[in-house]
Design a protein with these regions (language model features):
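Conserved N-terminal beta1-alpha1 strand-loop-helix module at the mouth
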Residues: 1-97, 115-128, 132-142, 165-176, ...
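Flexible loop residues that form catalytic
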Residues: 47, 103, 149, 212
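Non-cysteine beta-strand/loop elements that form the S-adenosyl-L-methionine
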Residues: 101, 141-150
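Short gly/pro/ser/thr-enriched loop/turn and capping motifs at secondary-structure boundaries
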Residues: 106-107, 151-152, 214-215
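Short, flexible/disordered intra-domain loops and linkers
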Residues: 156-168
C-alpha cells in the first residue's frame, strides 16, 4: 500500500499562486511550469475569487499535477477555504488539504472534516513567533508556514506585530525557529533566488514563493533556478555536517 499524501508530504519547494499573482496568465500555466521545474507542493490562494472560481482553479491545478505524473507526492492545497476543499472533493477533484491562518478555521476542525490522511498547514506569523511555534498544539497540523524574510506586496498581512509594523526575520531567527518547532517548517515572504543558499543553510524544510515564480517573465526558468539553488544549498550543508 502506498503512502498517504500526509505521509508523502514534501514542502521543500512550495508554490503559492492565484489569479492576482500571474501577470494575467492562467494559473494552470504557472502550476505547470513549477511542476516541470520540480516544485513539490502547490497552494491555490486568492482573496478575490468566489468559491466556485476557487474550485475551478483547484480542478485545473489537479489536472496539471495528474498530467505531470506526480499526484502521489505533490500536494495540492487551498488557502483558508475548508469549504472549497470539501466541495472540490465531492466533485471528484484531488484536493489534498488546506492551509489556514491563525484567525481562520482551527486546524483541528479542518482535520475533523478532511480526515487523517489530509494535509493541514498553519501560518505562524506573530511577533512572538518562536514561542508560538514552540508552544502550539501541533497534533492536527502537518507543517508551519512562517515568514516573512522581506517585506512583500503579495502577502501584506505577513509578519506584522500588534501595532501593524512589519517584522522580517533574520537567518539566525529562522534557524532557531526550525530548532524549536516540533513539525516541519516552510519559510517564505519576499524570498528571491539570491536568498535561497542562505535559507537552505538553516534548518527549515523548504521555501515558499509567490511572485518569484508566478510573476517571473519565464516562470519555468525561475522555478528551476530556485529548486536547483535549494538542492545545492542543502547538499552543501549536508556535506559540511559529515
Amino acid at each position: 500500500m502506498g503512502k498517504t499524501m500526509r505521509e508523502a508530504l514534501d514542502i521543500s519547494a512550495y508554490l503559492v499562486v492565484g489569479p492576482e499573482n500571474t501577470e494575467g496568465r492562467p494559473v494552470r500555466e504557472i502550476v505547470r511550469a513549477a511542476l516541470k521545474a520540480g516544485f513539490s507542493c502547490v497552494q491555490i490562494r486568492s482573496k478575490e475569487t468566489s468559491a466556485r472560481e476557487m474550485i475551478a482553479l483547484l480542478g485545473e491545478a489537479a489536472e496539471e499535477i495528474r498530467a505531470a505524473g506526480v499526484s502521489e507526492h505533490v500536494a495540492l492545497l487551498a488557502d483558508d477555504r475548508l469549504d472549497v476543499v470539501l466541495a472540490a472533493r465531492k466533485m471528484g477533484i484531488k484536493a489534498d488539504g488546506v492551509h489556514v491562518g491563525q484567525s481562520d478555521i482551527p486546524p483541528e476542525i479542518c482535520r475533523a472534516y478532511l480526515g487523517e490522511e489530509a494535509v493541514v498547514g498553519l501560518s505562524a506569523r506573530t511577533d512572538e513567533l518562536l514561542a508560538y511555534v514552540r508552544d502550539t498544539d501541533t497534533s492536527a497540523i502537518d507543517y508551519f508556514g512562517a515568514g516573512p524574510l522581506h517585506e512583500t506586496a503579495t502577502k501584506p498581512d505577513c509578519g506584522r506585530d500588534a501595532q501593524g509594523n512589519i517584522i522580517t526575520r533574520s537567518f539566525e531567527e529562522i534557524d532557531e525557529l526550525a530548532r524549536v518547532s516540533k513539525i516541519p517548517v516552510v519559510f517564505g515572504g519576499g524570498v528571491k533566488l539570491p536568498d535561497i543558499p542562505a535559507l537552505a543553510k538553516t534548518g527549515v524544510d523548504g521555501f515558499f514563493v509567490v511572485s518569484a515564480v508566478a510573476g517571473a517573465p519565464d516562470p519555468e526558468k525561475a522555478a528551476k533556478e530556485l529548486v536547483d539553488a535549494w538542492q545545492a544549498g542543502k547538499a552543501a550543508t549536508s556535506g559540511a555536517k559529515k
